[in-house]
Amino acid sequence: MKQLATPFQEYSQKYENIRLERDGGVLLVTVHTEGKSLVWTSTAHDELAYCFHDIACDRENKVVILTGTGPSFCNEIDFTSFNLGTPHDWDEIIFEGQRLLNNLLSIEVPVIAAVNGPVTNHPEIPVMSDIVLAAESATFQDGPHFPSGIVPGDGAHVVWPHVLGSNRGRYFLLTGQELDARTALDYGAVNEVLSEQELLPRAWELARGIAEKPLLARRYARKVLTRQLRRVMEADLSLGLAHEALAAIDLGMESEQ
């Protein structure tokens, strides 16, 4: 059969904010900005969407580990990198936003997150993983949305009530609550809390154990375990993004008055 998917040798060199390394079928995905902690930009937003697609299409990937660089996973955002002046700009954001989380869910092998530090921008991304490990320094907060007057409609509204339960999830989003690693563990958003030194070795230990399982067991386990989240995401993501866009446009108009 002709192989049409982009080979690892190509897509592993494709992204400026994502470092990709593979050993024994375990793919390590490290997000960064110039080798330091990831700054959330329009480029990082779009790159992750397309990188997740490349990963999903590569059947040589047996398990995926997702982690960050430096003291934080993603604790800073560059708002100036986003062009949000016209309906066409927002249409592009909605287009890419749908692909970001849907492409992550389209990966048909188990995904392990190793959250190396605070994450205030898109904290839903790591907690969508099948196994979530957190460093003791990790914190989780949805910073750029409701605390800033924006609807948390880009998938946060789907993921956090799913992970924390309806009441805790809504409270988390509406109050800007920051969860430390131990609280996230108690709430079920995190599976293990480890020291910074133990974090990646533990992720690799789990990944290698999963990689030894039969191919179809690995792939189909991922599919059945994410089915409910995929179904809700498909139903609610686009509407949430549209509402987020309207609220953001309204906020921008108010600030200009």
From Swiss-Prot:
For binding substrate, which residues are annotated in this chain's numbering?
A: W40, H145, D154, E244
Coiled-coil ranges (or none): none
Q: What is its EC number?
A: 3.7.1.18
The record's catalysed reaction(s) read:
bornane-2,6-dione + H2O = [(1S)-4-hydroxy-2,2,3-trimethylcyclopent-3-enyl]acetate + H(+)
This protein's UniProt keywords: Hydrolase
How is it regulated at the activity level? Inhibited by copper and mercury ions. Also inhibited by thiol active reagents, such as N-ethylmaleimide and hydroxymercuribenzoate. EDTA has a slight activating effect.
Which of the seven top EC classes does this enzyme belong to? hydrolase
Give the record's pH note.
Answer: Optimum pH is 7.
Q: Which residues form the active site?
A: E124
As one GO molecular function, the record gives: hydrolase activity, acting on acid carbon-carbon bonds, in ketonic substances
Known InterPro entries for this protein?
ClpP/crotonase-like_dom_sf, Enoyl-CoA_hydra/iso
Tell me the domain of life. Answer: Bacteria
Q: What does this protein do?
A: Catalyzes the carbon-carbon bond cleavage of the bicyclic beta-diketone 6-oxocamphor via a retro-Claisen reaction to yield the optically active (2R,4S)-beta-campholinic acid. It is also able to cleave 2,2-disubstituted cyclohexa-1,3-diones such as 2-methyl-2-propylcyclohexa-1,3-dione and 2-methyl-2-butylcyclohexa-1,3-dione which result in racemic keto acid products. Transformations of the bicyclic diketone substrates bicyclo[2.2.1]heptane 2,6-dione and bicyclo[2.2.2]octane-2,6-dione yield (S)-keto acid products.
User: Subunit structure of this entry?
Assistant: Hexamer. Dimer of trimers.
As for family, the record states: Belongs to the enoyl-CoA hydratase/isomerase family.
Question: What is this protein called in UniProt?
Answer: 6-oxocamphor hydrolase
What is the source species? Rhodococcus sp
